[in-house]
């Protein structure tokens, strides 16, 4: 083990003697296993050299995570981030005052009464998708969940119906899939363009921008714009504190951000929820009884526990832009990324008793602790968290009301990286019988 001291007074957490090339291979092939190995050897903070992210400090200590998320202007968003592929107008790419202004503008339509108005839309999409499910025959749930969350977000964000909805439904999934891969791969040399996901994403994004530009123009000219409840219409009606509106480019990039951040992650969490519930029939019995009685507390706790035990996002990170950042006993120099390992933190027995046990009751009657981070933390906490939670809650409520979820004795499904999100390796297989 080597604990390096850099020029000045910078002191980094322990690093590994594993060569950088092997570190990179471990991070690419199985990042979570690699981080677990380093955590078991070096503790809750260690230094690595990662592909794409470069020199990075990985932490899994709740107190240090709180320090990081309240570090203010000493840090910016982790580099690189999804803003690299979504565009400079995406909230992922914005910093400082511009980020705060955009967040203030977009928070109202994604919280409270506006999102409750979408609940029936979720019910309708769940029932339309599940109407053709086979009875008693096992199938992977992740693709149906993807279709449900895609349809919901396209209708809620764009107000799309009919041919517009069909066109977006064809266009968005391949764009999100290749974008997830591009986010984890640096741009390749020109010679390798045919296999470069960044190049493929650029083509898909150009098609998206051209089509969505037309939808924005159409919405702006809609004589009923003031009556519309979709997020595109709300963006067009909204202004910053200085009275200026969002530009068309900003709107297009922010809509793409919502699709990228809110579609795949929500669907993947739902697939994990179904995977977990099949292996815990006692939890399902409690959930069904609660649904039949019109309650929701145990279901909400179950969603929190799914997100704790099966976080779909690897980390919440920041990039040090000050001369250095003091974090616990460490002094991290400018240019480093600091990554909070969500999976490691959620498995910390000092934060969550018996973390290996799937136990929704740990969240009954209490708010999640600060160590619970499926949506990230600080000023960059997922702005769509309330929308995603509503969508997961209504989806599970509807499925449990309509179907009996058949239990299984099969082994738990393993993690599988889909690029940005970690999904069940067999797609969250389920079997159902109509109630």
Which residues make up each language-model segment?
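Cytochrome P450 heme-thiolate monooxygenase catalytic core
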Residues: 2-12, 76-83, 98, 114-268
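N-terminal membrane-proximal hinge/A-helix region immediately C-terminal to the signal-anchor transmembrane segment
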Residues: 1-95, 101, 116, 123-128, ...
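Conserved cytochrome P450 K-helix E-x-x-R motif and the immediately C-terminal K′/meander segment
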Residues: 24-43, 293-328, 349
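Cytochrome P450 catalytic-core helices
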Residues: 263-290, 385-403
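Cytochrome P450 proximal C-terminal region
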Residues: 4, 8, 39-40, 126, ...
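Cytochrome P450 I-helix active-site segment
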Residues: 11-18, 119, 123, 170-174, ...
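Conserved cytochrome P450 K-helix/beta-meander segment immediately N-terminal to the heme-binding cysteine loop
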Residues: 340-366
């Amino acid at each position: 083990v080597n604990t390096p001291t850099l020029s000045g007074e910078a002191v980094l957490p322990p690093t590994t003697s594993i060569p950088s090339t092997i570190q990179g291979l471990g991070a690419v092939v199985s990042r979570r296993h690699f981080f677990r190995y380093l955590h078991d050897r070096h503790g809750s903070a260690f230094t690595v050299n990662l592909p794409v992210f470069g020199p990075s400090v990985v932490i899994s200590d709740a107190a240090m995570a709180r320090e990081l998320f309240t570090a203010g202007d000493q840090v910016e968003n982790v580099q690189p981030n999804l803003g690299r592929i979504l565009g400079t107008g995406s909230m992922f790419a914005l910093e400082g005052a511009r980020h705060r202004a955009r967040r203030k503008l977009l928070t109202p339509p994604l919280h409270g009464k506006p999102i409750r108005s979408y609940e029936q839309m979720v019910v309708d999409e769940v029932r339309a998708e599940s109407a053709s499910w086979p009875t008693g025959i096992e199938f992977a749930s992740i693709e149906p969940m993807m279709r449900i969350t895609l349809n919901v977000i396209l209708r809620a964000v764009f107000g799309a119906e009919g041919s517009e909805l069909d066109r977006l439904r064809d266009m968005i999934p391949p764009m999100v899939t290749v974008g997830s891969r591009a986010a984890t791969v640096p741009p390749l040399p020109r010679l390798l363009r045919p296999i470069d996901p960044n190049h493929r994403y650029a083509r898909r994004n150009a098609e998206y921008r051209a089509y969505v530009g037309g939808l924005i123009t159409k919405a702006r000219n809609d004589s009923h714009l003031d009556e519309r409840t979709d997020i595109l219409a709300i963006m067009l009606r909204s202004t910053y504190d200085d009275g200026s509106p969002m530009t068309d480019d900003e709107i297009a990039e922010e809509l793409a951000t919502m699709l990228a951040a809110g579609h795949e992650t929500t669907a993947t969490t739902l697939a994990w929820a179904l995977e977990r519930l099949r292996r815990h029939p006692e939890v399902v019995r409690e959930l069904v009884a609660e649904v039949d009685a019109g309650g929701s507390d145990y279901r909400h706790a179950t969603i929190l526990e799914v997100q704790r035990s099966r976080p779909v996002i690897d980390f919440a990170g920041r990039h040090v832009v000050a001369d250095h950042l003091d974090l616990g006993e460490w002094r991290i120099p400018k240019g480093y990324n600091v990554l909070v390992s969500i999976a490691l933190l959620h498995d910390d027995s000092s934060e969550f008793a018996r973390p290996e046990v799937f136990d929704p009751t740990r969240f009954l009657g209490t708010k999640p602790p600060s160590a619970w981070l499926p949506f990230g933390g600080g000023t960059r906490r997922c702005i769509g968290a309330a929308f995603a939670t509503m969508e997961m809650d209504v989806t599970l409520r509807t499925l449990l009301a309509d179907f009996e979820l058949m239990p299984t004795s099969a082994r738990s499904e393993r993690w599988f990286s889909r690029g940005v999100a970690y999904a069940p390796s067999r797609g969250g297989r389920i079997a159902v019988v109509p109630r």
